[in-house]
Amino acid sequence: MNPNHPTPGQIPQLRQLWKAAFGDTDAFLDTFFDTAFDTKRCLCITADDEIAAAAYWFSCGDYAYIYAVATAAHHRGKGLCHTVMAAIHGLLQKQGYAGCIVVPGEESLRRFYGRMGYRDFGGIRQFTCAAAAPVLLRRLEAAEFAALRRTYLPANSVVQEGENLAFLSKWAEFYAGDDFLLTVTREGEQCWVPELLGNPDAAPGITAALDVKTATFRTPGNAPFAMYKSLGVKKPPTYFGFAFD
């Protein structure tokens, strides 16, 4: 069972595997497959005329972010995930990528990727705060956000534009203030800020300006988050922001 790029006709099977593995909605999958998916950035294994394992990646300049790695439940324990990942590593290296990135969803996966040569880098801080005196926010279009984000990122950070930004902009809002930049997603009364760059002390005022009682923020920090595997450049990046989680 060798990994191959999927055909367009296999997209329904890819979606079925994804939903079974991660529980995402059809709306989320519609957004991904409409804005971020390319058969050339996916490898899968077919067994008994069904997709048994698959993984995707986003191009992030010198790096590739490997995303949504999944194996069908009845095919687990056969090493298919490892086979797909190894094939992706080889392909990305041939394509000239400096390294690849994953964001494990749990500690067992962090150990699994560690055995494949991945190491923690950068880090995040995540916290929830209540609203305080509001600050001024300015709504941004995606292109302006991307340009401004480059000025806020730490040196040697992973730049996530192209299909990354196209995907993100379908379900997120972008704002800037005097000394900060943020991305916001909302679901009912829940407000999630998957990235706040700049002044983290502005978070309570941002929460008020977003007209919610509380909000959860993710900023650069020290807690384990992304992992890096070198494909030629040993030194990892300093920061990775959007896991699309």
Question: Locations of the language-model features?
Answer:
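Conserved GNAT acetyl-CoA-binding A-motif
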Residues: 92-105, 212-221
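Conserved acetyl-CoA-binding loop-helix of GNAT-fold acetyltransferases
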Residues: 68-71, 77-92, 115, 198-211
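Amide-forming acyltransferase catalytic core, primarily the GNAT-like/NAT-type
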Residues: 116-200
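Active-site rim helix/loop that mediates acceptor-substrate recognition in acyltransferases
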Residues: 11, 16-58, 150-174
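Conserved beta-strand in the GNAT
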Residues: 44, 50-58, 63-70, 101, ...
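Conserved active-site alpha-helix within GNAT-family acetyltransferase domains
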Residues: 82, 97-98, 105-123, 222-233
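A short beta-loop-alpha structural element at the N-terminal edge
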Residues: 1-14, 135-147
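Charged, low-complexity intrinsically disordered regulatory/assembly segments
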Residues: 190-245
